């Protein structure tokens, strides 16, 4: 079997801490970028890096090409599209987030206006004038590097949609429509845009057509409207049987196969010999047919009765007179045969039908068709589409043509055409976007074939019939909608072009386009607020495919089949990860290796297998292409040459799992984790967990809150590094080089010479994100993991983000767990934790709250942000500066003022006394009321940042200016560093050129003809080096160039500083009526406490019930107390045994770390340590980690980093075996069963049985008790019912529901119940009375009528029933 060999090169972070892998399979191909589906889709939409001539017909280019050229109504002027270009965004992503702007770029389109000479008589008319111009078409949102959009300052993700592919689909009603259970077949042509066309059978086997789900019509009406006569229709759908009249006898041309299954109504003889083949009354069988074929019978004499009741295939006309004797599709009668004989007509053509496989469906439909001509058919369709409107010939023709045959109204799209052609058996995948006559005919023919038992219906849940519509495509559709709105307006204006000398800019109003785009990104169901709790949740959100949304399904109507796992999901869509609840199965996640092809179908990679030998060639297969292949799983046993060893191989074929021989196998899976999504691939020992629990595990990992200090999982799957780097939360080196400078907020890299191209700077400056608020209020903070002087490669991790540790995803903490009951505190999944976890801040998290204060211009005057607030004491203002804004670093609690603000009050009539006092004391403060921003209840924390936005044109306050200064200082610092490095680089090259050269003169004591030495250069100032004159002209020229470079560098730096300064000091574009906005960011520290929700990675979740002092916790014999106690009853019934295996392997990992720490403390030699590490990493003799490539220092750093435990990787479906876990435990000198004797911390007694103890990775989820706890005394009430509102956000009350009423009734607590239902709820009078009574010290209750009873009365009256209360 092939096993994962070591990579030759390790990244900077990887060298510091290797993860020991148990994987047996080699990774044939690297995992593609996890965000590629988003990035590629939008890249194809914009096509910014593609030349105009090379642009593909997709995205913006396709939208413009489909709408332009726009012609005027008269046809004398037209607008043509030439090309487009995107400008530079005004602000970068970080600035857009801070300022609340949309990260977008201006779109300019080159439009050509062509005016024709309307007076000319030529056709086509000559061109009179051409005007070209760049027209601004609004702003197009840009995608960030991590696949998100910044819209109005918040990060959003556009989720891909899984919708029904355009094309044709055949299905049946499963026997539900008709009581007999008969299957009614139907076909539906689904275009990308345009009217749907349905064909369906009714219980009487007639074929009907519906357009856009309207009233059904016989299908022959549609065929007549297409120009087919009855004769043509029968000719298309039926074979004919020809009958000749010879010597008074009827002879039919015999095709023996057509007689099969009929009952002979007369004796059939061989004409030559008279031999009897079939007796009258016997059924004609295959044996009889063989005899007829053998005797080579050409025709058959039939009695006249045999023809009666048969259907004519052609019109019967007397050629001499032109008289119609019968129409096609008429039945043959005695009279008709007589008439034909008398008119001398000797040939009759009949249609061939039988009940088995040549049904008479179209013939029956023709009989119920009321129309007789094309015009009548068109009128009938017009009546169905536009009921009540009087039809005219022109209107009917135009309507029918516009339905399916005009490109503007109908488009199958390339996908639809491909699917359509493949389904109806057309060879080519290309064709027009509109329907043709032949298309409609072929669909009806295929439908009739299926009804006749030839062919199968389609499976609509097959991933070959569902395709993914990604961001780019959805944006393109919205853009097209906007352009079509523009087109209507432009057409009207184009008629004015000749009279007024207008330019393209005057004709086009870009508002509808921007509005459509803005609406899509701002409020579409698929443009969602990004899930940003941790890096995994972001990656998963971008890889999500949803069946909901515009043009998709709705929760209520989606049945079980759509939600279920389908065989085609294998390797394309994860069978595990989907939400619990109403959306289950409708929202899915892409599998790890999945991608979409050019048609939008999901593909999965497979290795090619030739003659039972596996090659390294990888092909991507869609569900359509996969059906006929034999595909083996990736864990098939192979020999060294890649030949399959087993005699029978489990494989997938025709959407079934079966066994087959190796020579039949065409493909093989790439990797065992190919089936699952990113989140599920992070669960170790997933193969030992029940699917329902794995679903919860993958969903709960996305809710893990970033802890104060991230800690890598001891037991992982090897996917952690990939997820962390692709998520974009950590800083990854764009180019290799040397770390020049590093501090907490930025990293400066001096780039390698071979990685800089001309015109690029040789410096990379990475500004780290510090304590930034995520969409879910968690904290985004980056910490550098490199030191000055470190050499790094492109792609190395330079700084860890939230939930990453040394470049690996780290969502939680490794805790020492014991599976045992403890005084009932872990009953029903409760969790018991040690006080040490709280004390060590293992699960302390930082949450950042954004509080906003807005000063508006009101009718009574302007609101003002100030520290001068009426009736507020000095102490309340102690945290504010002179501008009235809180200081950074201030610790605030609920109710504290953050931003002082006063609002003008309406002028009230003053009494004469007040007027006198006002005149004496000049008291003016009473004109304003305090409307300051205060800390909301239940919140306290530290102010970490303040942003002040001032309207353009208003004077900035001192605080706003100081924030600007800080910002400018940061920009200046970056530019100074960049300039320093680039200057050093230039001077280094200058010194290299000058050394040992002969000078002709220069500053200082340099004599002509002397050589230049390093000492001389050290003494002379660097700026004067350029004044040194040299004999060699070529070198002089190079020096001159370097001198110019230095000048240009100075100018460039000044320009960049001024540009940044302009951006920073310009006023802000605020909403109308807003003068100033102050945003205060509070960092709230949340320690773990009872009521918080925790979970493992295997769906084992619970709520903390108690925090126990360390001395009371169960401890081992060496005194180590466990961190957390879980209930063992949570494992067997849930069937997530993965957590137990993880616990054992975690114990081994920690034990190995202890052994390494011991060796380091004993100062053992690097060779001894290397030998021990070799045993750990390459346990089965296969070199997975190449320790030889590390020098002694790197080895010792690695060993030091392993003190806390050796991280293990057990890949999904390819993980550690039980034997391997035992061998690791033994290597760490631990018991092989993973059980330990524990001692009760309170009594000092040993527990009766040994307990499973080990290390498990636990997460703290974003369901914190602080966010949920809530209490209310008085508050707001609902307007109609006057009952208190519900929920924490509305400061609501506790619901006293139906069942609580029953409980009080059962106790007979009548007064308590009355109080609950009246004065504590919606008895408005009683509420105020009881308040007054309590104030007066009188505790009696006087309940009145509950308001909800009055509402009930009003509702009954609304029904027209007079109801009144009788008062005694």
UniProtKB/Swiss-Prot annotation:
Instruction: List the keywords (alphabetical).
Output: DNA-directed RNA polymerase, Nucleotidyltransferase, Transcription, Transferase
Reactions the enzyme catalyzes:
RNA(n) + a ribonucleoside 5'-triphosphate = RNA(n+1) + diphosphate
E.C. numbers: 2.7.7.6
- Under the cellular component aspect of Gene Ontology, which terms does the record hold? DNA-directed RNA polymerase complex
Q: Which GO terms describe its biological process?
A: DNA-templated transcription
Q: Which GO terms describe its molecular function?
A: DNA binding; DNA-directed RNA polymerase activity; ribonucleoside binding
Question: What Gene3D superfamilies has UniProt attached to this entry?
Answer: 2.40.50.100, 2.40.50.150, 3.90.1100.10, DNA-directed RNA polymerase, beta subunit, external 1 domain, DNA-directed RNA polymerase, subunit 2, domain 6, RNA polymerase alpha subunit dimerisation domain, RNA polymerase Rpb2, domain 2
Q: Does the keyword Transcription apply?
A: yes
Q: Which domain of life is it from?
A: Bacteria
Q: What class of enzyme is it?
A: transferase
The keyword Nucleotidyltransferase belongs to this UniProt entry's keyword annotation? yes
Q: Which Pfam family, an example, fits this chain?
A: RNA_pol_Rpb2_45
CDD domains under this entry? RNA_pol_B_RPB2
Q: What does this protein do?
A: DNA-dependent RNA polymerase catalyzes the transcription of DNA into RNA using the four ribonucleoside triphosphates as substrates.
Record note on quaternary structure: The RNAP catalytic core consists of 2 alpha, 1 beta, 1 beta' and 1 omega subunit. When a sigma factor is associated with the core the holoenzyme is formed, which can initiate transcription.
Family, as annotated: Belongs to the RNA polymerase beta chain family.
Record's NCBIfam families?
Answer: PRK00405.1, rpoB
Q: Which PANTHER family match?
A: DNA-DIRECTED RNA POLYMERASE I SUBUNIT 2 (PTHR20856)
Could you identify this protein by its name? DNA-directed RNA polymerase subunit beta
């Amino acid at each position: 079997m092939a096993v994962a060999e070591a990579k030759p090169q390790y990244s900077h972070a990887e060298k510091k801490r290797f993860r020991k892998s148990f994987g047996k399979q080699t990774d044939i191909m690297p995992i593609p970028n996890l965000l590629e589906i988003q990035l590629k889709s939008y890249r194809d939409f914009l096509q910014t890096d593609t030349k105009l001539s090379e642009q593909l017909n997709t995205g913006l280019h396709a939208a413009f090409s489909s709408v332009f050229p726009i012609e005027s109504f008269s046809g004398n002027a037209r607008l043509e599209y030439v090309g487009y270009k995107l400008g530079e965004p005004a602000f970068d992503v970080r600035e857009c987030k801070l300022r609340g702007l949309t990260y977008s770029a201006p779109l300019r389109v080159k439009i050509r206006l062509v005016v024709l000479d309307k007076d000319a008589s030529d056709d086509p008319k000559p061109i009179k004038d051409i005007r070209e111009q760049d027209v601004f078409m609004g702003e197009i949102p840009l995608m960030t590097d991590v696949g998100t959009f910044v819209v109005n300052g918040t990060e959003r993700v556009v989720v891909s949609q899984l919708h029904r592919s355009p094309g044709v689909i055949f299905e049946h009603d499963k026997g539900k429509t008709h009581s007999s259970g008969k299957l009614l077949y139907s076909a539906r042509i689904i275009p990308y845009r345009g009217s749907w066309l349905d064909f369906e059978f009714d219980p009487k086997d007639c074929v009907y057509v519906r357009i856009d789900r309207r009233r059904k019509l016989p299908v022959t009406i549609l065929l007549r409207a297409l120009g087919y006569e009855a004769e043509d229709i029968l000719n298309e759908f039926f074979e004919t049987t020809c009958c000749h009249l010879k010597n008074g006898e009827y002879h039919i041309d015999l095709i023996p196969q057509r007689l099969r299954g009929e009952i002979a109504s007369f004796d059939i003889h061989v004409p030559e010999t008279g031999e009897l083949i079939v007796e009258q009354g016997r059924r004609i069988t295959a044996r009889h047919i063989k005899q007829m074929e053998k005797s080579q019978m050409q025709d058959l004499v039939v009695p006249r009765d045999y023809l009666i009741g048969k259907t004519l295939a052609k019109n019967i006309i007397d050629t001499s007179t032109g008289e119609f004797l019968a129409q096609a599709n008429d039945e043959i009668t005695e009279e008709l045969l007589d008439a034909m004989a008398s008119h001398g007509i000797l040939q009759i053509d009949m249609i061939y039908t039988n009940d088995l496989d040549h049904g008479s469906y179209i013939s029956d439909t023709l009989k119920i068709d009321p129309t007789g001509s094309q015009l009548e058919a068109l009128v009938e369709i017009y009546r169905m589409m536009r009921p009540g409107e009087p039809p005219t010939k022109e209107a009917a023709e135009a309507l029918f043509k516009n339905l399916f045959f005009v490109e503007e109204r109908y488009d199958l799209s390339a996908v639809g055409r491909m699917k359509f052609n493949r389904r109806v058996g057309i060879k080519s995948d290309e064709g027009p976007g509109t329907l043709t006559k032949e298309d409609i005919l072929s669909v009806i023919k295929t439908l009739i074939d299926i009804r006749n038992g030839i062919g199968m219906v389609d499976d609509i849940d097959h991933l070959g019939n569902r395709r993914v519509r990604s961001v780019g495509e959805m944006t393109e559709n919205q853009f097209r909608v906007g352009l079509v709105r523009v087109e209507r307006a432009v057409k009207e204006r184009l008629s004015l072009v000749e009279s007024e000398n207008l330019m393209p800019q005057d004709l086009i109003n870009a508002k509808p386009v921007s509005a459509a785009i803005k609406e899509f990104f701002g409020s579409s169901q698929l443009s969602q607020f990004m899930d940003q709790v941790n890096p995994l949740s972001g990656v998963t959100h971008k890889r999500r495919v949803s069946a909901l949304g515009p043009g998709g399904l709705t929760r209520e109507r989606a049945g079980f089949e759509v939600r279920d796992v389908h065989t085609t999901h294998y390797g394309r869509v994860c069978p595990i990860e989907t939400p619990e609840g109403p959306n289950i199965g409708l929202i899915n996640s892409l599998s790890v290796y999945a991608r979409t092809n050019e048609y939008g179908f999901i593909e999965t990679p497979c290795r090619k297998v030739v003659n039972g030998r596996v090659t390294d060639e990888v092909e991507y297969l869609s569900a359509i292409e996969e059906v006929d292949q034999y595909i083996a799983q990736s864990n098939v046993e192979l020999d060294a040459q890649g030949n399959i060893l087993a005699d029978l191989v489990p494989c997938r074929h025709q959407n079934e799992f079966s066994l087959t021989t190796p020579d039949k196998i065409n493909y093989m899976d790439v990797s065992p984790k190919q089936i699952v999504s990113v989140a599920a691939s992070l669960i170790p020992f997933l193969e030992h967990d029940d699917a329902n629990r794995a679903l919860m595990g993958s969903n709960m990992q996305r809710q893990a809150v970033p802890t104060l200090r991230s800690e890598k999982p001891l037991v992982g799957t090897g996917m952690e590094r990939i997820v962390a780097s692709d998520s974009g939360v950590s800083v990854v080196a764009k180019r290799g080089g040397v770390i020049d400078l590093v501090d907490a907020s930025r990293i400066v890299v001096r780039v390698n010479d071979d990685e800089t191209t001309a015109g690029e700077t040789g410096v990379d400056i990475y500004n780290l994100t510090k304590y930034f608020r995520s969409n879910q209020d968690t904290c985004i903070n980056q910490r550098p993991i490199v030191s000055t002087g470190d050499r790094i490669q492109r792609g190395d991790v330079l700084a860890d983000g939230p939930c990453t540790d040394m470049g690996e995803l780290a969502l939680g903490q490794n805790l020492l767990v014991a599976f045992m009951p403890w005084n009932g505190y872990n009953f029903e999944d409760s969790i018991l934790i040690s006080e040490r976890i709280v004390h060590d801040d293992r699960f302390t998290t930082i949450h950042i709250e954004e509080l906003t204060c807005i000063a508006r211009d009101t009718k009574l005057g302007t609101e003002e942000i100030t520290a001068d607030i009426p009736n507020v004491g000095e102490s309340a203002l102690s945290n504010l500066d002179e501008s009235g804004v809180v200081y950074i670093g201030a610790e605030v609690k609920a109710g504290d003022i953050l931003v002082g603000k006063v609002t003008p009050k309406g002028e009230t009539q003053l009494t004469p006394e007040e007027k006198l006092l006002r005149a004496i004391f000049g008291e003016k403060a009473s004109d304003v009321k305090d409307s300051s921003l205060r800390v909301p209840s239940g919140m306290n924390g530290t102010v970490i940042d303040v942003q002040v936005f001032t309207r353009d044109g208003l004077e900035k306050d001192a605080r706003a200016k100081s924030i600007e200064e800080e910002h400018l200082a940061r920009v200046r610092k970056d530019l100074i560093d960049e300039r320093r490095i680039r200057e050093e680089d230039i001077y280094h090259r200058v010194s290299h050129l000058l050394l040992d050269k002969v000078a002709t003169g220069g500053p200082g004591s340099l004599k002509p003809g002397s050589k230049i030495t390093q000492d001389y250069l050290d003494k002379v100032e660097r700026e004067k080096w350029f004044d040194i004159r040299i004999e060699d002209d070529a070198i002089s020229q190079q020096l001159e160039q370097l001198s110019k470079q230095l000048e240009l560098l100075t100018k460039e730096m000044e320009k960049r500083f001024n540009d940044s300064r302009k951006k920073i000091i310009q006023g802000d574009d605020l909403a109308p009526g807003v003068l100033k906005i102050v945003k205060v960011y509070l960092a709230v520290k949340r320690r773990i406490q009872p009521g918080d929700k925790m979970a493992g990675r295997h769906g084992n979740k619970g709520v903390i019930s108690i925090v126990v002092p360390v001395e009371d916790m169960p401890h081992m014999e060496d005194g180590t107390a466990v961190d957390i106690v879980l209930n063992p009853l949570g494992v067997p019934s849930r069937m997530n045994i993965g957590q137990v295996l993880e616990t054992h392997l975690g114990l081994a990992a920690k034990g190995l770390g202890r052994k390494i720490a011991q060796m380091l403390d004993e100062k053992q030699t690097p060779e001894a340590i290397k030998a021990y590490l070799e045993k750990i990493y390459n346990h089965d003799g296969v070199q997975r980690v190449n320790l030889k490539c590390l020098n002694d220092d790197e080895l010792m750093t690695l060993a030091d980093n392993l003190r806390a435990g050796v991280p293990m990787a057990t890949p999904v479906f390819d993980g550690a075996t039980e034997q391997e876990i035992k061998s690791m435990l033994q290597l760490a000198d631990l018991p092989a069963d993973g059980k330990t004797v524990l001692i009760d911390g309170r009594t000092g007694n040993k527990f009766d049985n040994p307990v499973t103890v080990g290390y498990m990775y636990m997460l703290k989820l974003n369901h914190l008790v602080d966010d949920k706890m809530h209490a209310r005394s008085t508050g707001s009430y609902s307007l109609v019912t006057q009952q208190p509102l519900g929920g924490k956000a509305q400061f609501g009350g506790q619901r006293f529901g139906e069942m609580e009423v029953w409980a009080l009734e059962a106790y007979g607590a009548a007064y308590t119940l009355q109080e609950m239902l009246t004065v504590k709820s919606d008895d408005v009078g009683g509420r105020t009375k009881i308040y007054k009574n309590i104030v007066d010290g009188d505790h009696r209750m006087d309940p009145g009528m509950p308001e909800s009873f009055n509402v009930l009365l009003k509702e009954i009256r609304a029904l027209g029933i007079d109801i009144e209360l009788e008062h005694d």
